[in-house]
Amino acid sequence: MATATYPPPPPYYRLYKDFSENTDSAPEPPPPIEGTYVCFGGNYTTEDVLPSLEEQGVPQLYPKDSNLDYKKELRSLNRELQLHILELADVLVDRPSQYAKRIGEISSIFKNLHHLLNSLRPHQARATLIHIMELQIQQRKQAVEDIKRRREEAQGLLKDAFVTLDGQ
């Protein structure tokens, strides 16, 4: 009795046997989803928009200024977070029943930190792409220079070979 390692392919694979000769034999892929959709019970949207803290029900701890100094605000929130964690340690030692308020404040600070960091992601992605493209340009220039150098070496070797052959 022989057993197969893999199960047999589904019967509809025969519908696409001539795909290499005729690309129209396969059905077109479904169009991309636009708007909202449900996946594993969660509602998602295809729009890449960062919801505001107010929409999420979180108080905003930094100014709503359009010219926000991200570095300054991140440092400020980080210092505030450190202070609240130390206060939480004091509360847990002295008044353990009041820890819930401190946990809520720490959670709010973390959410503000993450919101600020997430708002920087498009800038970081753009800077990363610029860096990658600059590296690619540099590598291509280096490759061109390497090809030119090797071509000159090959031409020199050919000239030497012609001189040697002509001298004999």
Curated annotation (Swiss-Prot):
Primary residence: nucleus
InterPro entries, A to Z: Med7/Med21-like, Mediatior_Med7, Mediatior_Med7_sf
Keyword vocabulary terms for this entry: Coiled coil, Nucleus, Transcription, Transcription regulation
GO molecular function, one term: transcription coregulator activity
Comp. bias regions, Pro residues: 1-12
Region feature (Disordered): 1-33
GO biological process annotation, one example: regulation of transcription by RNA polymerase II
Organism domain of life: Eukaryota
Chain coiled-coil ranges: 64-92, 132-162
GO CC terms in record: mediator complex
Location of this chain's protein in the cell: Nucleus
Its job: Component of the Mediator complex, a coactivator involved in the regulated transcription of nearly all RNA polymerase II-dependent genes. Mediator functions as a bridge to convey information from gene-specific regulatory proteins to the basal RNA polymerase II transcription machinery. The Mediator complex, having a compact conformation in its free form, is recruited to promoters by direct interactions with regulatory proteins and serves for the assembly of a functional pre-initiation complex with RNA polymerase II and the general transcription factors.
Family of the protein in this entry: Belongs to the Mediator complex subunit 7 family.
Binding partners and assembly: Component of the Mediator complex. Interacts with MEE14/CBP1.
Protein name as it appears in the record: Mediator of RNA polymerase II transcription subunit 7b
